[in-house]
């Protein structure tokens, strides 16, 4: 408990690769796929070139 008083958790830098950051990347990929007309809104997956977006149908 003394460690928490000396070193609060707010001073510890968080890792940038947290799962909370991944949806933003995924949304960017979906947006690109929608522009290329490869995103299936009904099935919520990518049809066509799967290296452009994920998940792939």
Curated annotation (Swiss-Prot):
Disulfide bonds: 45-57, 46-53, 50-56
Subcellular location: Secreted
Propeptide: 17-44
GO CC annotation terms, alphabetical: extracellular region
UniProt superkingdom: Eukaryota
Keyword Secreted belongs to the record: yes
UniProt keywords, alphabetically: Disulfide bond, Secreted, Signal, Toxin
Pfam families, A to Z: Conotoxin
Expression tissues: Expressed by the venom duct.
Signal peptide: 1-16
Annotated GO MF terms: ion channel inhibitor activity; toxin activity
Membrane-spanning residues: none
Family per record: Belongs to the conotoxin M superfamily.
Domain notes: The cysteine framework is III (CC-C-C-CC).
Record-given protein name: Conotoxin reg3.17
């Amino acid at each position: 408990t003394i460690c928490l008083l000396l070193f609060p958790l707010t001073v510890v830098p968080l890792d940038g690769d947290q799962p909370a950051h991944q949806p933003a990347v995924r949304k960017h990929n979906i947006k690109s796929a929608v522009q290329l007309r490869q995103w299936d809104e009904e099935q919520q997956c990518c049809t066509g070139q799967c290296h452009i977006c994920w998940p792939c149908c």
